[in-house]
Amino acid sequence: MEKFQGYLEFDGARQQSFLYPLFFREYIYVLSYDHGLNRLNRNRSIFLENADYDKKYSSLIVKRLILRMYEQNRLIIPTKDLNTNLGHTNLFYYQMISVLFAVIVEIPFSLRLGSSFEGKNLKKSYNLQSIHSIFPFLEDKFSHFNYVLDVLIPYPIHLEILVQTLRYRVKDASSLHFFRFCLYEYCNWKNFDSKKKSILNPRFFLFLYNSHVCEYESIFFFLRKQSSHLRSTSYEVFFERILFYGKIQHFLKVFVNNFPAILGLLKDPFLHYVRYHGKYILATKDTPLMMNKWKYYFVNLWQCYFSVWFQSQKININQLSKDNFEFLGYFSSLRLNSLVVRSQMLENSFLIDNVRRKLDSNIQISSIIGSLAKDKFCNVLGHPISKATWMDSSDSDILNRFVRICRNISHYYSGSAKKKNLYRIKYILRLCCVKTLARKHKSTVRAFLKRLGSGLLEEFLTGEDQVLSLIFPRSDYASKRLYRVRVWYLDILYLNDLVNHE
């Protein structure tokens, strides 16, 4: 129990003094020489992956802004002279300093992440960074599970909750006060001029979100790590205890005293957790009763410990054999494949019916058509229309845009078990391209295709389509069979909008 209590009472050695580089502002020149402080761990910070933030700020500018704020005498400025221009100048101050604050705070998190992998002999693999790398794992593991919890991660509405989340990691009170001051001032000016979206600071709020989720996952993973097997002692179930609804300031004491009861509830050897796009899924081989207990555990954890109002309706319990669950643009479900095997022993023969469970991932075509309709590629029914906003571009530019979008969609949804919906999306983009070019040249679609021939549509063939056409030019059965094979690419690091693929 002492080691559990030592873990729950956050170690003071992990707390950091973040604001000292700002106070001793002469040392802030170190930031300008290090280019984002990402070389300390020989790896890029986890908060900077696939983000082009290095070009959007300058530490030297922040240095000068801090000097100006120190030299400025705010007492001699009357209130009536605070016009809009001065307000935007102050907003620029807060924005730049908040960026630098996020850079400084990221350092211990990055170092802590690097130290956690030391001694584990993990090889660097860029394939594990791909979004598609999770799907082979799901196909291998989820076929043995029964239920999946689909949960939307709540985010605190009040700013003070975000400040309190970082209080365990911050040693000096000045850092906490400075963080609170910048956060409130920045949000006030953002609400004052909400039309200018370009002034938003994604790096600062990305750090807040990651720190919020990291705090939640540290508790959840600790409980999961200590679990091994479910015990059947009903009186130790934690959710039925009145002490759980005690005051928040006494939560740690209640948590430690009832620790065996919590582990008695959560002990499950088959449990997998995946977080993505502000959501997470929890797959397990359990009973409906246990899934409901997991559901209310998350609700009570968010409400009592993180002071975030969280409704149980935001947690969906999906039975894999009956329901579909949405995951990264796919609809996934378990399919039962019957395999009949004939076994013969001497003069007797037997028919053995084996049922295999296989995870199928299909395209959610309604959402893709909705995205295409929103960007004026088709109407809400999926009928292609001409792209009027691209009329001023050259023919080659228009064709390249459509081909790039079509190939990106085919590249991402190549793992679908049924390619019929994917072919429909390709058809919409092809016909939209032809209608756009025909409208630009003031011609009909039929006349335009007759003049250019079918070579125009061959540009939409993806790499795998061209390979299949070369390997199986005559065998229709083999070609159709290979077209049903799912392909997962390990070079997709992030998702962009369908139209803005570069």
From Swiss-Prot:
An example Gene Ontology biological process: RNA splicing
Protein's cellular compartments: Plastid, Chloroplast
One MF annotation (Gene Ontology) recorded for this entry: RNA binding
Keywords noted in UniProt: Chloroplast, mRNA processing, Plastid, RNA-binding, tRNA processing
Gene Ontology, cellular component aspect: chloroplast
Name of a matching Pfam family: MatK_N
Keyword Cell membrane annotated: no
Primary residence: plastid
Family classification: Belongs to the intron maturase 2 family. MatK subfamily.
HAMAP family: MatK (MF_01390)
General function of this protein: Usually encoded in the trnK tRNA gene intron. Probably assists in splicing its own and other chloroplast group II introns. Binds its homologous trnK precursor transcript.
Protein name: Maturase K
Origin organism lineage: Eukaryota, Viridiplantae, Streptophyta, Embryophyta, Tracheophyta
This protein's encoding gene: matK
